[in-house]
Amino acid sequence: MMAAAPIQQNGTHTGVPIDLDPPDSRKRPLEAPPEAGSTKRTNTGEDGQYFLKVLIPSYAAGSIIGKGGQTIVQLQKETGATIKLSKSKDFYPGTTERVCLIQGTIEALNAVHGFIAEKIREMPQNVAKTEPVSILQPQTTVNPDRIKQTLPSSPTTTKSSPSDPMTTSRANQVKIIVPNSTAGLIIGKGGATVKAIMEQSGAWVQLSQKPDGINLQERVVTVSGEPEQNRKAVELIIQKIQEDPQSGSCLNISYANVTGPVANSNPTGSPYANTAEVLPTAAAAAGLLGHANLAGVAAFPAVLSGFTGNDLVAITSALNTLASYGYNLNTLGLGLSQAAATGALAAAAASANPAAAAANLLATYASEASASGSTAGGTAGTFALGSLAAATAATNGYFGAASPLAASAILGTEKSTDGSKDVVEIAVPENLVGAILGKGGKTLVEYQELTGARIQISKKGEFVPGTRNRKVTITGTPAATQAAQYLITQRITYEQGVRAANPQKVG
């Protein structure tokens, strides 16, 4: 067994008995051929101990560790497993996910992973939304389309099955890092083993692509499905880990000092992780955002620490999504210099899913603030994205006196009947409703997913009395409704600007 040492949560010792990184063993045979899957070898390990390395979204790490490390300590006691977690900002290359290494019996590995998967599912869906993946691109020796056609018609592969992994959220995914030799066993001869795993579990199982020429030492297995489907698939994958004598050859949890390419965490695209997608540090992000005054709230990065993780997700997802859509951050009242605004746009563009990336980063800040007991000033609770009009009245005419939205957009704000949520009503000109809906309603759905708010638009022909404006009702937490209102308002003003520059454009 490896020597125990305190875990570091957000860079501070918590006294949790988690192992230190073992020496990084990087020497082992090249990837095993698929035929290895038919050879029943058993890796007995040390006293029946095996290793399972998984990725954990940074926003879910805090709930797994628990206050002062209590949750993870109790989990180790109950399962007999040893759990190691990379430091708070030591992410797997190309992601904002931390690496978790579990050591224990087969039963312990399954139990610990079941607990981790449950914690990830408990997080808000707007946080856990992952970047799209496609099953149409080859990632193993198996043709995924052919597998889809041969899957049995059963309760595990019917409507409840994630038949379209492109829409599968991170909450319904499992990501396991395995050595090449184990990957060969999981694939099997001609893809027979991975096909069998999918048929038996009902989940989709995809491996990061195998590169031509240079061999990666590890590959990432992505499992997509409902909780029970994923559980069965993980059990079958752990069986292959048990069979592989080399399954314990890559026990590092930090990739900071790993030289050479690393496997992509996604099953499609390049075989290699894109390290450019790694998020900036908290200090770098704070410098990027600047110390702006948002509706009278000073020092933006400092104020953020006073919000809960969910509020930060709603606020930051909204802002970062605007950047990813190409909105000019100089018009948003963030107090950014031209250089900083350009940098923010570049940072957003560098990520395949900028909204989720921002949410992860800010959720980490919230975790740090909670651990240190820091709070923002008394104005934090009254932070209002919707009132950014006061800060942006002089920017490119948006929200200025000439804008009809500045005077009459907000119809009212009240509490829901049970008092648990805010209800905000705004008026939107009939000819601009399409800008909010988007093609096939895509934009509206995306805004709801990103903010966590419910957005309803009055039916066609139902106007605010005395106007030709449709009523938009936003329901959710204060932060969610404000973020949704901000997204909608910015979308409308952007559309107005486009139409003003091009009078021939119609709604």
From Swiss-Prot:
One of its GO terms (biological process) is mRNA splicing, via spliceosome. Residues 1-44, 139-171 are annotated as: Disordered. InterPro entries: KH-I_NOVA_rpt1, KH-I_NOVA_rpt2, KH-I_NOVA_rpt3, KH_dom, KH_dom_type_1, KH_dom_type_1_sf. Residues 150-169 have a biased composition (Low complexity). Expressed in neurons of the cortex, sub-cortex, cerebellum and brainstem (at protein level). Expressed in motor neurons, but not in glia. GO terms for molecular function: mRNA 3'-UTR binding; mRNA binding; RNA binding; sequence-specific mRNA binding. Pfam families: KH_1. The keyword Phosphoprotein applies. Disulfide bonds: none annotated. Residues 419-503 are annotated as: Required for RNA binding. One of its GO terms (cellular component) is nucleoplasm. It is linked to Defects in Nova1 leads to neuronal death in spinal and brainstem neurons. The KH domain consists of approximately 70 amino acids and includes a conserved hydrophobic core, an invariant Gly-X-X-Gly motif, and an additional variable segment. The third KH domain (KH3) binds a hairpin RNA loop containing the 5'-UCAY-3' motif on targeted molecules. RNA binding by KH3 requires residues C-terminal to the KH domain. Interacts with PTBP2; the interaction is direct. This is RNA-binding protein Nova-1. It comes from Mus musculus. The lineage of its organism: Eukaryota, Metazoa, Chordata, Craniata, Vertebrata.
